[in-house]
Amino acid sequence: MTKKQIREGIGLTALNIFFIVLCFVTLIPILYAVSVSLSGQNSLLSSDFSFIPKDFTLDNYKKVIFGEDILTWFKNTVFLAVVTVSLSLLIAVPAAYCFSRRRFPGRKPILKCLVLLNSFPAILSMFAIYRLLRPMGLVNHRVGLILVYTGTMAVFSLWNTKGYFDTIPTEIEEAAKIDGASDIQVVTKIVMPLAKPSIITTALQVLIYVWNEYIYATTFMTGESKYTLAAGLNSLQATEMTGSWPVFAAASITVSIPVLIIFFKCQKYMTSGLTAGGVKG
């Protein structure tokens, strides 16, 4: 081996060690939450920091799994997530294909305007959205929250899928039309299968947003039976679970598991779906 190869090998090894340590550091809060959730001691911060629970118990998870409130909030969140993902993709995918393949007056200004509107933080539009939803009776109603979520994520979905459509060569569609395929057949049998990584990635991003969203959920949902998981966990932490951090930690870990499972199942689509959409978008 040459000196250059040795230096490159040492540098690559050092870089790998650095990223391993960095990953471990970022996992410390999660590992500590897992440790607290498995502990029978009711203490969150103590001088004897340890990742291994001293009084190991699964009672905290039993209280969470068999609690009626958690199940209700879980159902609410799943319903909101499924409907929001479906509506966002139903709106964004056709619009993204149109913006990618068609050239019409005002195309670029519309895209820039959508990005500008979506760049403001959610809290700035909170009062305006509340004033719009209240006269329609959509405050403390799941339909109102679905409209807010869909309007928020449809823009992101449009941009991400449009970027991926831009990477699909138009020659493929032209060749299919020469072979006698109609416009609908080109879209459904050629373009959509090729855009599958981007669509799945976009759907996953919308799902994660709805699952973790807190500001809108706590503002527009005032009834405890209509809380999402994020709003419900906050209400529990602020009330009866204030003195039971292990149960709260167990609840936090439990509600994260479904999204983690879906994420790992769809992980193979994430790289191509995000990078291609980000580069061309």
Where are these regions (language model features)?
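A structural signal for multi-pass alpha-helical bundles of membrane permease subunits
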Residues: 3-281
